[in-house]
Amino acid sequence: MPKIEVKPYNQDDKSKKQEVAEMFDNISARYDFLNHFLSLGIDKIWRRKAINQLRSIPVINIIDIATGTGDFAIAALKLNPEEVIGLDISAGMLAVGEQKMIKNKVDSIIKMQLGDSENIPYDSNYFDALTVGFGVRNFENLELGLTEMLRVLKPGGKAVILEFSKPKRFPIKQIFGFYSRYFIPFFGKRISKDAQAYSYLPESVAAFPEGKDFEEILHKIGYKNIESTLVSGGIATIYAGIK
């Protein structure tokens, strides 16, 4: 069966990339509150665990793809880099992120930049490390985005990808299924005023090639020493690979 593309608004005249940018622009003002509220704050723990995967390599510069408002970029400061780039296609999310960087007095290190993950505006072999938090399932062309990520990494550089997955074990599978299908869309709609944005979340998670399937895609593209770590009973997975 052909793979069905999951888009936030399912508009025939717009690409997935356009709809994703529009969606995040629409919810940018309430995104941080909703993100931490709906994840019960666990997303912060996941990011810290993901960043710890990069402690095995020297990190002078790092790019956070699909950075949103920059939470992962801020978490990357634990690695003491000299330069952090936060790249995103949503101008609305970046505007919120820029104010966050100024408020936290880290705007001299973290640069928020408008850009496309499938056409990263940096030279090949430029970054020591790369992170993506809950962003790869939003790529219009998953393999192209992953290929671009590999291109901008230096030889020996490391990519760490944090993404939602589907728990397999009782009772986490049942609890997460109910939570993602009903609780998140209900509160997301009322707080963000965008009904589709938080219905898109469980739909995009369900369609994403997780686990071994995603590892095979990474291997096919050219990532090496690929590892995956389940967190919180499989609600999310941390993938890591070397160039």
Predicted regions and their residues:
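N-terminal auxiliary segments of SAM/dcSAM-dependent transferases
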Residues: 1-22
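C-terminal alpha-helical "lid/dimerization" subdomain adjacent to the S-adenosyl-L-methionine
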Residues: 18-19, 89, 162-217, 221, ...
